[in-house]
Curated annotation (Swiss-Prot):
This is Vascular endothelial growth factor B. Belongs to the PDGF/VEGF growth factor family. It comes from Homo sapiens. It is found in: Secreted. It comes from the Eukaryota. Keywords: Disulfide bond, Glycoprotein, Growth factor, Heparin-binding, Mitogen, Secreted, Signal. The gene is VEGFB.
Length: 207
């Protein structure tokens, strides 16, 4: 059999083999699939700098569009798993790398440089809580004046508080003296009592 005929026969067998083999067919004896060891799986998944794809999007103020070639680049960024859910993979060392990008602004084009950040060292650190990012409202001093309150006062909506009610101070003069009370005006003095007694005696003598 000629070498050319052997090649044609081998090519035909290779094309027919996948179609004839069932999907659930187990591996043939002696042909075991390669299994990645646990240590390799763990090492690949740890927090470390790894190559990631970063898209490049540029928006111009004008109406002329600028196209970047390539539209995305690959840089080293931190990523991977941490041993605890409360930890996250963060960069502890980074540097800037400059790349040449072809900028197309029709009908011309030119090479430009773009600076991107790359991570050189990574570490698993505790995740930042919301309280550490957002300021605590209780700790923030309020400059709004607080309304004055009097113990036992339960004011209705819109009613003034006793502490807010001011009483005018009387001006000095005759009007500043307190007027006699109703009780003192009705109580007779010594002269009035003597006159009443004399009138009573005269009335009795006439009778």
């Amino acid at each position: 059999m000629s070498p050319l005929l052997r090649r044609l026969l081998l090519a035909a067998l290779l094309q027919l083999a996948p179609a004839q083999a069932p999907v659930s067919q187990p591996d043939a004896p002696g042909h075991q699939r390669k299994v990645v060891s646990w240590i390799d799986v763990y090492t690949r998944a740890t927090c470390q700098p790894r190559e990631v794809v970063v898209p490049l999007t540029v928006e111009l103020m004008g109406t002329v569009a600028k196209q970047l070639v390539p539209s995305c680049v690959t840089v080293q960024r931190c990523g991977g798993c941490c041993p605890d859910d409360g930890l996250e993979c963060v960069p502890t060392g980074q540097h800037q790398v400059r790349m040449q990008i072809l900028m197309i602004r029709y009908p011309s084009s030119q090479l430009g440089e773009m600076s991107l950040e790359e991570h050189s060292q990574c570490e698993c650190r505790p995740k930042k809580k919301d309280s550490a990012v957002k300021p605590d409202r209780a700790a923030t001093p309020h400059h709004r004046p607080q309304p004055r309150s009097v113990p036992g006062w339960d004011s209705a909506p819109g009613a003034p508080s006793p502490a807010d009610i001011t009483h005018p101070t009387p001006a000095p003069g005759p009007s500043a003296h307190a007027a006699p009370s109703t009780t003192s005006a009705l109580t007779p003095g010594p002269a009035a009592a003597a006159a009443d007694a004399a009138a009573s005696s005269v009335a009795k003598g006439g009778a």
